[in-house]
């Protein structure tokens, strides 16, 4: 399925700017691009239409020989991260061309994908917002437990998807319908209203919606 065009970037942090009416607007600063096109895929050669973009310059010692050879074809240097974007008309892009923040304009709506902050192993009260058990009156050693996880003989197993303690965070998250507040091509920066997933300096993909 074809996607809207986008670029890779890094989440710099959160700040606020002031609108023309004097109101404060919380924004996330994303340093995005420039992202060179390293490969153009078509139905004839690869079975589907897409372009591959690169981001985050890297040293040769951090890449293997196949990666170095592949990036050399684009002639734009070495990069740490590669991503594909499926498009309906990839022929409009050439290997070696660059994508930058001028893809976006103030007022555009975008979706931002990233990896959420990992919280480690957490109990049900923090992970799923369970209320927990009573503090007193017959309750012993199970104040923060999740309670029963199923019946006995029937069904005889725990249903898939049951909310229990476990690893929380460090998973792919996409936030939709974020407004582009400002675009600053001279700094390769876009300002997006609201929050985006991931820690500071985390890798994100910003796509048109």
From Swiss-Prot:
One Pfam family cited in the UniProt record for this chain: Ribosomal_L3
Molecular-function annotations in GO: rRNA binding; structural constituent of ribosome
GO cellular component: cytosolic large ribosomal subunit
Keywords tagged on the record: Ribonucleoprotein, Ribosomal protein, RNA-binding, rRNA-binding
Domain of life of the native organism: Bacteria
Single GO BP term: translation
Function: One of the primary rRNA binding proteins, it binds directly near the 3'-end of the 23S rRNA, where it nucleates assembly of the 50S subunit.
Subunit structure: Part of the 50S ribosomal subunit. Forms a cluster with proteins L14 and L19.
NCBIfam families attached to this UniProt entry: L3_bact
Stated family: Belongs to the universal ribosomal protein uL3 family.
Name of the featured protein: Large ribosomal subunit protein uL3
Organism: Nitratidesulfovibrio vulgaris (strain ATCC 29579 / DSM 644 / CCUG 34227 / NCIMB 8303 / VKM B-1760 / Hildenborough)
Primary gene name: rplC
């Amino acid at each position: 399925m074809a996607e809207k065009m986008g670029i890779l970037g890094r989440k710099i942090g959160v700040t606020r700017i002031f609108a023309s009416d004097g109101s404060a607007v919380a924004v996330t600063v994303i340093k995005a691009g420039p992202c060179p096109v390293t490969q153009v895929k078509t139905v004839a050669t690869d079975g589907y239409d897409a372009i591959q973009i690169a981001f985050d310059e890297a040293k040769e010692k951090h890449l293997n020989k196949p990666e170095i050879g592949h990036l050399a074809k684009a002639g734009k240097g070495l990069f740490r991260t590669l991503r594909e974007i499926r498009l309906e008309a990839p022929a409009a892009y050439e290997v070696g061309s660059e994508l930058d923040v001028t893809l976006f304009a103030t007022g555009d709506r975008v979706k931002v994908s990233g990896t959420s902050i990992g919280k480690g192993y957490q109990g049900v009260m923090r992970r799923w917002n369970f209320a927990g058990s009573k503090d007193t009156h017959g309750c012993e050693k199970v104040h923060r437990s999740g309670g029963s996880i199923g019946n006995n003989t029937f069904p005889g197993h725990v249903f898939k998807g049951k909310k229990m303690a476990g690893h929380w965070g460090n998973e792919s998250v996409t936030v939709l319908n974020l407004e582009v507040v400002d675009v600053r091509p001279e700094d390769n920066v876009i300002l997006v209203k609201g929050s985006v997933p991931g820690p500071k300096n985390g890798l994100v993909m910003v796509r048109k919606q």
